[in-house]
């Protein structure tokens, strides 16, 4: 995983610049959780451009076919990256949200389970796909998204996210499964 400092002549430490603009909301959605809110990155045109440029520069020469984004904030980031790279975008949705024939993958949550789905014709065998989400916590959602894409015959080149919460173990789990990861920054705790 790459959390190295990204440098820019205009901004200096781009990683720090973006990290400093992520809002921390204590005790949301439940007591003890420090929620990492990326909406300030999206609301400011300069930070949004810097954020997207970090991903575009990383992936512009990777010979990708598609970008897949995980419901819901992965849609925002993933679709813009796909547009900038002149690629198609594939939504990975929560169960029951896609209108056509789907393939589903269940994954475990802290208290129970959830399911994500992808259209059965979302990609074809051999497609090289970048998988995007806003944040890696336990890794369950990104792992499920990867499994869906691979079941359709695609190769997930890398998983990308803005934030990694390494103490929750998701990035370690994903890397142990063989998935290469890129995150812009990380935060301690959850």
Curated annotation (Swiss-Prot):
UniProt-listed Enzyme Commission number(s): 2.4.2.7
Record-level GO BP terms: adenine salvage; AMP salvage; purine ribonucleoside salvage
UniProt key word Zinc: no
Major subcellular site: cytoplasm
Matches recorded under InterPro entries: Ade_phspho_trans, Adenine_PRTase, PRibTrfase_dom, PRTase-like
Pathway: Purine metabolism; AMP biosynthesis via salvage pathway; AMP from adenine: step 1/1
Job description of the protein: Catalyzes a salvage reaction resulting in the formation of AMP, that is energically less costly than de novo synthesis.
Name the UniProt record assigns to this protein: Adenine phosphoribosyltransferase
Species assigned in the record: Cupriavidus metallidurans (strain ATCC 43123 / DSM 2839 / NBRC 102507 / CH34) (Ralstonia metallidurans)
């Amino acid at each position: 995983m790459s959390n190295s400092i990204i440098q820019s002549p205009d901004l200096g430490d781009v990683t720090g610049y973006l990290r400093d603009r992520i809002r921390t909301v204590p005790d949301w959605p439940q007591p003890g959780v420090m929620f990492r809110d990326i909406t300030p990155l999206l609301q400011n045109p300069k930070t949004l451009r810097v954020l997207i440029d970090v991903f575009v520069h990383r992936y512009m020469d990777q010979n990708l076919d598609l970008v897949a984004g995980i419901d819901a904030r992965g849609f925002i980031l993933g679709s813009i990256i796909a547009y900038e790279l002149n690629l198609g975008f594939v939504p990975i949705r929560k169960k029951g949200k896609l209108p056509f024939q789907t393939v589903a993958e269940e994954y475990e949550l802290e208290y129970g389970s959830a399911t994500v789905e992808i259209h059965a014709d979302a990609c074809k065998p051999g497609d090289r796909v970048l998988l995007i989400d806003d944040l890696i916590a336990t890794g369950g959602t990104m792992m499920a998204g990867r499994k869906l894409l691979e079941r359709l015959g695609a190769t997930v080149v890398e998983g990308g996210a803005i934030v990694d919460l390494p103490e929750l173990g998701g990035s370690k789990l994903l890397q142990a499964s063989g998935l290469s990861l890129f995150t812009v920054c990380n935060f301690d705790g959850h």
